[in-house]
């Protein structure tokens, strides 16, 4: 039997497991430092079984909070579902402390039902379903105040106990940064026998304070061996509804996402404008992807690149 981990345990999946100073004196140190002795998490087998009919998993990541990652997840889901009606799409909201997808996808107040095959995700459209902790709270104002292990347990339940059915693509809306949630979901979904099934998209805004954290997110993906489909620059410009002039709300001091992508050797999928119509529609849970405007034209290019890369 393994002993409880030390307070600053790097985690058994870490390359530093059993090797850093926090591991000194831990009775599990010899197990963690020797790959041949590491125990397989039984949850991985459960997740693999539950995900066997999900062709592709796509992590939507952002190094910095407030860059519109959840909104981009919603826009991608809506546009993909409309453009590829024969495909099935799912959204998993693993931002445990700040779930946004029920509101953004117009599913506030919906309930999750349980059957013999697990939790049934909430249907959004004919070919879109959603699972979020937001459906399990008593009120939309309830705070989720959980430490890492409890968050990880919830994520494992979402991955192993939700009856997703046959999905062509599952989009995972993640919290900002590289926290417990990210390490947990990657450890469960990464399959060395099928590395092409898990990918990532990284969302940023043009200013350097966001790009600084995006570089860290890119390095996280590279260290975790997650292929990056590309970067989406959100809120790249704003077009005035009165005069029609375009301006930069977040000026790109160092060349924005385009320069950063060249520097980090990752693709730039495209740029989305700061669109008041998107803000209003997401607050109301409405779909604007049938309209033809600057946002949907950009989405068409981005979604085409995503589907051709999978």
UniProtKB/Swiss-Prot annotation:
Q: Which residues constitute the signal peptide according to the record? A: none
- Provide the Gene Ontology terms for cellular component: cytosol
- Residues that hold [4Fe-4S] cluster 2 according to the record: 240, 243
Localization, per the record, is:
Cytoplasm
- Origin: domain of life: Eukaryota
Provide one Gene Ontology biological process annotation.
iron-sulfur cluster assembly
Give the residues the record marks as binding ATP. 63-70
Binding-site residues, [4Fe-4S] cluster 1? 9, 23, 26, 32
What the entry lists under InterPro entries is as follows: Mrp/NBP35_ATP-bd, NUBP1/Nbp35, P-loop_NTPase, YlxH/NBP35
Which chain regions cross the lipid bilayer? none
Q: Which UniProt keywords apply?
A: 4Fe-4S, ATP-binding, Cytoplasm, Iron, Iron-sulfur, Metal-binding, Nucleotide-binding
Q: Which protein family is it in?
A: Belongs to the Mrp/NBP35 ATP-binding proteins family. NUBP1/NBP35 subfamily.
- What does it do? Component of the cytosolic iron-sulfur (Fe/S) protein assembly (CIA) machinery. Required for maturation of extramitochondrial Fe-S proteins. The Nubp1-Nubp2 heterotetramer forms a Fe-S scaffold complex, mediating the de novo assembly of an Fe-S cluster and its transfer to target apoproteins.
Record text on subunit structure and interactions: Heterotetramer of 2 Nubp1 and 2 Nubp2 chains.
Protein's UniProt name:
Cytosolic Fe-S cluster assembly factor Nubp1 homolog
Which gene is transcribed and translated to give this protein?
Nubp1
